[in-house]
Amino acid sequence: LVAILWLYNLAGTFDLPTLRALALSHHLAATPTALLLCSIAFLVAFAVKVPVFPLHGWLQDAVAEAPTAVVMVLAGKLGLYSILRFSFGIFPEQSRHVAPVLIALGAIGIVYGSLIALIKTDLKKLAAFSTLAHASFVILGIFTFTIIGLDGGIFQILNESLIGAAFFILLGLLYERYGTYDMRDYGGLATRHPWMVTMFVITVLAAAGLPMLNGFVGEFLILSGSMSSIVAHHIFWTVFAATGVIFGASYLLWMIQRVFYGSLGHRPEEVRGWDLTAREHLELWPFAALFLAMGICSPFWMRAIDTYGTAAASLQEIDYAADATLPADTTTQDRLALEHARTTYPGLDPELNGHSLPHRAHTGDLITILPLDSKPTQEAR
């Protein structure tokens, strides 16, 4: 709230399009330090909501105590959307300045959340730290400031919203039958609940990033964007985050083994219940179909993200006036198309003709055209 009032004092308006236009034209009446502090205030507020490591202290108890329906909303991605909508939209340059810190926190959050989930015996607390790990993946992707990383981050927001909803529905169904979230009270349920274990396995494999399912596409794009990002400085955080994929698969598969396989739990007299009902099948199978469709038909979904998602993420235009490697009369659209072509098709000389490629880029991608030694041909322009 303090940051919002401060921003109003600087701009004299709460209108988001006006604020964005003032930010992009550098007409906000404030020093760079003041704008940076204001952007950090917004980021901290949204980071608590996501949550971003180490601001996650509230998440475990909130998820463990809240009803399933509330948790499905609580574990949503409003914090991540807010970062894309407000921080990137109003403070694009300032967000890029703090990006290395957020990349590091994202990578640490992936590994930390996965390792803590490995030692949890409460299913809801395990799900809480799984939420932390997967939200950290999105943070890593969007703060790479590359097209592929940003697209992967937006795709992963959609993925985790669906996977999280399916997972918490399944936990609620399990609790409805047995009255506990403690994994030590379960075991050997696969023979009693074959359809339930099938849905659990599909959801877990999607969350773990199995190829041909939706989780793989998002994580692959994020790690690829992180690897190619100049903002990340080097590949250390990418490699570090990639280990979290292994730990993530470990705690998810370990949960399946403890709940549905092996011997009965500590209270075998309470092992009773029924498999999925017709209504529950209708609730869960659309999720499974979406996991597969988004994994196999990912180009279709990525085209939708390219068209609408990046606009929602407030991709800012770039001032290329200082770029002396291109002709002075090169238009911004031609520059963006040339940059996109060269990052998408390295080694090729694209024939754009003004229409064949999206005319968009991000501040972090400016690095890719600054080192060019020769002027582009007229055909390339």
Where are these regions (language model features)?
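Hydrophobic transmembrane alpha-helices and their helix-loop junctions in integral membrane proteins
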Residues: L1-F220, S224-Q257
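Cytoplasmic/organellar membrane-interface segments at the starts of transmembrane helices
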Residues: T191-W195, L252-H340, Y345-G354, G364-P371, ...
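Soluble catalytic regions of membrane-associated enzymes that act on cell-envelope
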Residues: L357
